[in-house]
Amino acid sequence: MTAPPRIAFLASPAEPAVAARARLTQRYGDHALDSADIVCALGGDGFMLQTLHRHGAADKPVFGMKLGSVGFLMNQYRDNEDDLLERLQRAEPAYLRPLEMQVQTESGASAGSLAYNEVSLLRQTRQAAHLSVDLNGQTRIAELIGDGVMVATPAGSTAYNYSAHGPILPLGSHTLALTPIAPYRPRRWRGAILKADTEVRFRVLDPYKRPVSVTADSHEIRDVVEVTIRESTQRQVTLLFDPEHNLEERIFSEQFAV
């Protein structure tokens, strides 16, 4: 008989998530992350992203259950906790590769971060950002004027990217969305769909008069002068979903939401 998986339960600080964790650990035990087979994250999408950033390198599959305001990356939490092992056994995997971001700032400092949803550049003041856009070393837009621009993964394409009128990308399509944010010029440019291995470089054309910040998921860096983004070839995380609500179907269904 196969032993049940060892589960590490992680919860957001929200009271419903903390209470759910207490009930689940009483039922299934409380395993440390380094000895667990599966991570169960209790919260919303924000907590799921936090979990991936903090523990993605542990290479443990993550099964999220929604106890927050947004749960696109989560499964539904059910009051009947007795079926969790069956759900884990039936769960379907989704494999996500984050974006790697490298940044140069006005002060000459360098910084880096990962993003599972998107990397977005935004103006810091009332003045529009002026940016150049290079793809694989070739300048494609010499001057983009607007509030900013972003690069989104398929998993993140239904979030901020979609709100900015960017395309929804199928999971496993090996593509990225390049989406302007409130563009003024070029007026007719609405972004592009890129191959996942494309290197994207943004340069801030007037960083002193028109300062720009960059955010990788929730990690913000201000006063940037150059940002380079590429899909990670080293890091991959596995999310687990109930078969009837798998991530691929959710992304597909979003294209028909009214």
Curated annotation (Swiss-Prot):
GO BP annotations of the record are: NAD metabolic process; NADP biosynthetic process
Identify the cofactor(s). Answer: a divalent metal cation
In terms of InterPro entries, this protein maps to: ATP-NAD_kinase_N, ATP-NAD_kinase_PpnK-typ_C, NAD/diacylglycerol_kinase_sf, NADK
Q: Where along the chain is NAD(+) bound?
A: 45-46, 117-118, 147, 155, 158-163, 182
| Gene3D superfamilies named among the record's database cross-references | Probable inorganic polyphosphate/atp-NAD kinase, domain 1 (3.40.50.10330), Probable inorganic polyphosphate/atp-NAD kinase, domain 2 (2.60.200.30)
The Gene Ontology CC terms held by the record are: cytoplasm
- One protein family per Pfam: NAD_kinase_C
Indicate the principal place this protein occupies in or around the cell: cytoplasm
Q: What does this protein do?
A: Involved in the regulation of the intracellular balance of NAD and NADP, and is a key enzyme in the biosynthesis of NADP. Catalyzes specifically the phosphorylation on 2'-hydroxyl of the adenosine moiety of NAD to yield NADP.
The entry's family comment says: Belongs to the NAD kinase family.
Q: What is this protein called?
A: NAD kinase
In its UniProt entry, the species of origin is given as Xanthomonas euvesicatoria pv. vesicatoria (strain 85-10) (Xanthomonas campestris pv. vesicatoria)
Q: Which gene name belongs to this protein?
A: nadK
